[in-house]
Amino acid sequence: MDRAGALAAFEAEDCSTPRSWGNGPGDAYGRHSHERHKVLFCLRGSIVFHLDHADVELAAGGRIDLPPGTTHGATVGPEGCECIEAWR
């Protein structure tokens, strides 16, 4: 999925205003959760989401949905990543 496709998906699913972000290789986010449903697309590079039941690797074009209260962390892949996300 490219940026235009992600934006179209956010609009079709009545999501909030999207936010883009990126990180360098190996950057990590500690385990946390959100009160709202997060929809996230990886646009460039890769990122691994660490969920309670499994690790989910997103490469460019990948999507992950994180329902409210889903505990997760993440580690950015070796080439960094660029992502876009919104709340649903």
Can you describe what each PLM-predicted range is?
Residues L7, A28-H34, H50-L51, T75-V76:
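Short histidine-centered beta-strand/loop micro-motifs
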Residues C15, P25-G26, R44-I47:
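Short, charged/polar surface micro-motifs in flexible loops or helix N-caps
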Residues T17-H34, P68:
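Conserved short histidine dyad/triad with adjacent acidic residue
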Residues P25, E35, A54, T70-T71, ...:
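A generic "binding-loop/recognition-motif" signal
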Residues S33-F49:
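Short, conserved beta-strand element in jelly-roll/cupin
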Residues H53-P68:
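Short acidic-glycine-tyrosine-enriched beta hairpin
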Residues P68-R88:
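Ligand-binding loop in jelly-roll beta-barrel domains
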